[in-house]
Each structure stands twice: as structure tokens, then as C-alpha cells.
Amino acid sequence: MWLPFGLLLMATRIVIGLTFPRWLSIPILQATGIRYTIKGLPNRINEDTEKRSKGMLYACNHRTLLDPLFLSFSLNKPLTAVTYSLSRVSEMLSPIPTVRLTRDRDLDGRIMESMLGQGDLVVCPEGTTCRERFLLRFSPLFAEMSDRITPVALNSHVGMFYGTTAGGLKCLDPVYFFLNPCPVYSACLLGTVRGMGTCRDVEGLKFEVANHVQRMIGESLGFRCTSLTRRDKYMVLAGNEGIV
């Protein structure tokens, strides 16, 4: 009985998110039943960011394709998202700027460096969505991009419709999420971690930083940290390497 109304509600929420300015869309979306919470010190982080020539780098776990969007809404500030394997549909419909990474380490490093010079950046080092109660291995590239990294623990809660874990279209994540009557997103800012923006030649340190950020997020969410890669995930669940 919910599905017909849910489809109408989902379409309404997506149209609002895509067409209304952020300051107006946030209260309207909340009125439709969407809830989001944020813990941490966003005001202090905003002030620190304004004093630096480089934007803040937010590193978060990857629950759904909506992660960067809800972080932007929670902080009430513009963010640019860098992501792997983003479909053209998701890229075109995203209400925040998105930049596609190539899995070429040197090229991706230059892309992220350029984006940080223009403003705040959010990256999901797992490289793919993971909806279970564990974290995939964090790629260490983000640890080399900035001296100051803000780990963010993200989680989503829905009651009826869930996004796919392995196969299927990831661009349908927003559809499944917004079909739910009262979906919830939570974000927890976990302070600031020292990155390697000025000391990239220290071999091995980037892995320590990446693992430390993973542990911080895992402890905050109560998730288990693993060394599984995105390739491991797709080989086990779908029998392929998950290349889009």
C-alpha cells in the first residue's frame, strides 16, 4: 500500500533536492520526513578552513551514493565530491560538484590537489559502497593530499527499501533511500588528523594515516575494520571486479 505514495514522495524529494537552493531545500526535505543528524564541531572547522589557502579534506566511509550530499547538507556548506565509478546519470543529477577519479594514482593525486585549491573536498577512501557493518581498506592517496584531514563517520537508516550491495545500478541509491517514509542519515565529525601534505616522501606513513582514519571511523560506528579491497568485495559477492 505504501509504494504508490512512496513513489510520489520519492519524486518530490528528488525534484526539491535538485532544483531548490540548499538553504531552502533542507527544511522542506525535513518536512517530508527525512532526518539527518550531525555531531562534531562544524563551526570551528569552518573558521579554520577560512584561514587556510587550501580547503578542508573530509574522509568518510561510503554507505550510499548520497554520502557527500548529506555531508554537504549537514554542514550547510558547498563541498566537491571525488569518487570512483560514478555513473553519468548520477554525475549529471548531483546537486553538488562531482569529480570522477581514474584509478591512476598520479593523475588522481593531481586532480585532488587541484580541487583542494578551489575549496573543501570530500572523498570516500573505500572506493565503493559498503552497506554491511564493516569497513573496506582505505586507499592511502587521500592521506598525501592535505596536512589536515577530518574523518567523518556516516551511517544511514531505512525501514523498507535498501540499495543493492553488489550487483545492480548504484545510481538507484537515491531512489531506494527516498522511497522510505522516514529515512535517517547521521554524520559524526571526528576531529582533525594530521595528513602528509608536506611530507609525502616518508614511505609507509601514508598507510598509517589511512589506517588510523579507518580505525577512528570504525570505532565511532561500531564497525569492524578490514583489509578487504573493493575488488575483494565484488569478486566474493558478484564474481567480477566491479568496474563500471
Predicted regions and their residues:
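N-terminal hydrophobic signal-anchor/signal peptide
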Residues: M1, L93-E113, G117, S146, ...
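Generic beta-sheet signal
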Residues: L8, K54-C60, L79, V82-Y84, G117-P125, V152-L154
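A cross-family acyltransferase "interaction/gating" segment
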Residues: V89-M92, G119, R131-F207, R224-N240
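Short amphipathic C-terminal alpha-helix that caps PH/PH-like domains
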Residues: E208-S220
